[in-house]
């Protein structure tokens, strides 16, 4: 890679990092607003029913990378290298439902236009599956950080790193979708002059 290409890549990465940091307060505030609405509507009870299933899936992911973990209901236990046990509580608000709401909101603007139904279905399925997988990986990362680096690192990642992951995922998802799944709208193409 030439120096000019490397410099362009570095500037792009810096610009993306700045964009993510600028969006972070907006997304965090939006998540808090969604949480308040969910509590008022009573959505927290059905979401809490999902927590034990997600906890067991996270334990499976952690076991796959060699971290000893166990789950019981909404509690999860991870052991560090010294054999000390760390208890984590996974609540209805930690499972990532807000990221699915953000994804749904992005569908409203991202699927405007005249795309074929097949492409729209692919976008929705890939987006939902990717977001759910990201949420599992995010919770597993919090647990792994608690087991390896301690509670402070896990809390910081839970509060801020997870939000950055979701925003980064949405950017990457829409770049991928626009490039490879959604066909270009013919009205966006420049017209050729005919004589």
Describe every region a protein language model picked out.
Residues 1-195:
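Hydrophobic N-terminal alpha-helices or hydrophobic patches in metabolic proteins across all domains
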């Amino acid at each position: 890679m030439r120096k000019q290409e490397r410099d362009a890549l570095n500037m792009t990465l810096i610009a993306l990092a700045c964009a993510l940091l600028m969006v972070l307060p907006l997304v965090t505030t939006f998540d808090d607003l969604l949480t308040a609405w969910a509590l008022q509507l009573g959505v927290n009870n059905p979401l809490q029913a999902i927590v034990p299933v997600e906890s067991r899936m996270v334990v499976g992911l952690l076991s796959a990378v060699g971290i000893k973990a166990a789950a019981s209901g909404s509690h999860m236990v991870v052991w560090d290298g010294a054999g000390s046990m760390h208890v984590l509580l996974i609540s209805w608000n930690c499972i990532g439902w807000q990221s699915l709401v953000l994804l749904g909101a992005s569908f409203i603007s991202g699927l405007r236009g005249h795309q074929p139904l097949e492409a729209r279905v692919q976008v929705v399925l890939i987006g939902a599956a990717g977001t759910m997988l990201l949420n599992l990986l995010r919770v597993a990362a919090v647990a792994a950080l608690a087991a390896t680096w301690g509670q402070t690192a896990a809390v910081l990642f839970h509060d801020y790193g997870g939000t950055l992951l979701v925003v980064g995922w949405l950017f990457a998802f829409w770049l991928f979708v626009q490039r490879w799944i959604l066909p270009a709208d013919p009205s966006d193409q420049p017209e050729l002059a005919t004589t």
